Swiss-Prot record:
It catalyses: 5-amino-1-(5-phospho-beta-D-ribosyl)imidazole + S-adenosyl-L-methionine = 4-amino-2-methyl-5-(phosphooxymethyl)pyrimidine + CO + 5'-deoxyadenosine + formate + L-methionine + 3 H(+). This is Phosphomethylpyrimidine synthase 1. Signal peptide: none annotated. PANTHER family: PHOSPHOMETHYLPYRIMIDINE SYNTHASE, CHLOROPLASTIC, THIAMINE BIOSYNTHESIS PROTEIN THIC. GO terms for biological process: thiamine biosynthetic process; thiamine diphosphate biosynthetic process. Substrate binds at residues 95, 124, 163, 185-187, 226-229, 265, 292. Keywords: 4Fe-4S, Iron, Iron-sulfur, Lyase, Metal-binding, S-adenosyl-L-methionine, Thiamine biosynthesis, Zinc. Binds 1 [4Fe-4S] cluster per subunit. The cluster is coordinated with 3 cysteines and an exchangeable S-adenosyl-L-methionine. Pfam families: ThiC_Rad_SAM.
Length: 433
């Protein structure tokens, strides 16, 4: 029985109880959300211990960190370090997206070390192994695609991005639409090229019921991949993207009937003024399924600082109702991220998600009040504790110690807070009577 099957029967699972406790909501609230498809809990039956993470309506916006090798840089130890850094800095999930080296080994190593849910994109493995064997991904056998899904499910992958919404109609719309930035989804590119070269429908779309059988057997979450997402602001919310979203909504109906949990991937590159419309459109067409925004990137010119660009997009997306954000690092569009990039990406995205959650009422700024009180009292330890990244806050202060330990080197003896605190404590306050 899957989490969704149990929820539909009225059963509250241990995972639902754990999510409820972490989110400060009732177990029944979580059960209803899972039953309706508005909350997903990635937890493969083949993993003995994985944190119960709830994604969806009424819950804290979650942050995903992607890791993985490239063809140019294959360093499994570094990828493990990146995973550990993401976990230490409180990413909620990981995605292992390697395309270089032994793909089975690196995936299993990450699964072994990660206490949080791990996702993947199985068509990467199918395409890469075909390229190694036959020279090009267009020679993929359909069976190779499904074997990759089944293998990764047996390994314990908790959620998989499946490119099942690329079909002939979405490709026709993409062709007619034309784009400034082209198609930027790697999985979408593999599938689209295969379809065009072979003159056939996408097997992942055509055999979606088979994918549902595999997902139901192992109870992993289908992350409905957005292959038609824009890779440039100029292409945002175009006909190809909307056409794909319509297909995704129809596939989600079938997944829910089968008792399979889903989340829906979204943009991408999108200007701030279109984020709310995209969230409304996705929630309407996909009947409230959890929305997984990739970044989003709200301007194309932030190279080297795209984690900041994404943090802005994450805040706006979470505020508008998005449920899950994939981080972006400073290396985005430039290079494979290093461990330090991963840390920066996780923290920046967590800040954006936190800001958005304040808008949608997930929290009332309790941590902000804690920080405000600590600052007023010049209590530096309490300030560190309240910070999003205590270690970084402490590092900066320790590197530049002030002469007066109550203050910082920005204001020193002219610290406004200290001056006012001392004045109010010592001055004649009859003026306020």
């Amino acid at each position: 029985m899957t989490q969704m099957d149990e929820a539909k029967k009225g059963v509250i699972t241990d995972e639902m109880k754990a999510v409820a406790e972490a989110e400060n909501v009732t177990p029944e609230f979580v059960r209803r959300g899972v039953a309706s498809g508005k909350i997903a809990i990635p937890s493969n039956l083949n993993r003995e211990e994985v944190a119960a993470v709830g994604i969806g309506a009424g819950l804290r916006t979650k942050v995903n960190a992607t890791i993985g090798t490239s063809t140019d840089i294959v360093d499994f130890d570094m990828e493990e370090e990146k995973a550990r850094i993401a976990i230490e800095n409180r990413a909620d999930t990981l995605m292992e997206l390697s395309v270089g080296g032994d793909l089975d080994e690196i995936r299993r190593r990450i699964l072994d070390l990660s206490p949080i849910p791990v996702g993947s994109v199985p068509v990467y493995q199918a395409a890469i192994e075909t390229i190694r064997e036959k020279g090009a991904s267009i020679y993929m056998d359909e069976d190779v695609m499904f074997r990759a899904i089944e293998k990764q499910a047996k390994d314990g992958i908790d959620f998989m991005a499946i490119h099942c919404s690329v079909n002939r109609e979405t490709l026709r719309r993409l062709k007619r639409q034309g784009r400034e930035g082209g198609l930027v989804s790697r999985g979408g590119a593999f599938v689209s090229a295969w379809m065009v070269e072979n003159g056939l429908e996408n097997p992942l779309y055509e055999n979606f019921d088979y994918i549902l059988e595999i997902a139901k057997e192992h109870d992993f979450v289908l992350s409905m991949a957005n292959a038609m997402r824009a890779g440039a602001i100029a292409d945002s919310t175009d006909r190809a993207q909307v056409q794909e979203l319509i297909v995704l909504g129809e596939l989600i109906d079938r997944a829910r009937e089968a008792g399979v949990q889903t989340i829906v991937e979204g943009p991408g590159h999108i200007p701030l003024n279109e984020i709310k419309a995209n969230v409304i459109l996705q929630k309407k067409l996909c009947r409230g399924a959890p929305f997984y925004m990739l970044g989003p990137i709200v301007t194309d010119i932030g190279a080297g600082y795209d984690h900041i660009v994404s943090s802005i997009g994450a805040a706006a997306s979470a505020a508008a109702g998005a449920d899950f954000i994939c981080y972006v690092t400073p290396a985005e569009h430039l290079a494979l991220p290093y461990p330090d990039d991963v840390k920066e990406g996780v923290i920046a995205t967590r800040i954006g998600a936190y800001v958005g959650d304040m808008v949608k009422g997930i929290h009332n700024g309790e941590k902000d009040l804690e920080m405000a009180n600590a600052r007023k009292k010049l209590n530096w330890e309490a300030q560190f504790d309240a910070a999003m990244c205590p270690a970084e806050a402490r590092r900066i202060r320790d590197e530049r110690p002030p002469e007066d330990p109550d203050t910082c080197t920005m204001c020193g003896e002219y610290c406004a807070v200290k001056i006012v605190n001392e004045w109010l404590d010592s001055a004649d306050t009859r003026i306020f009577d």
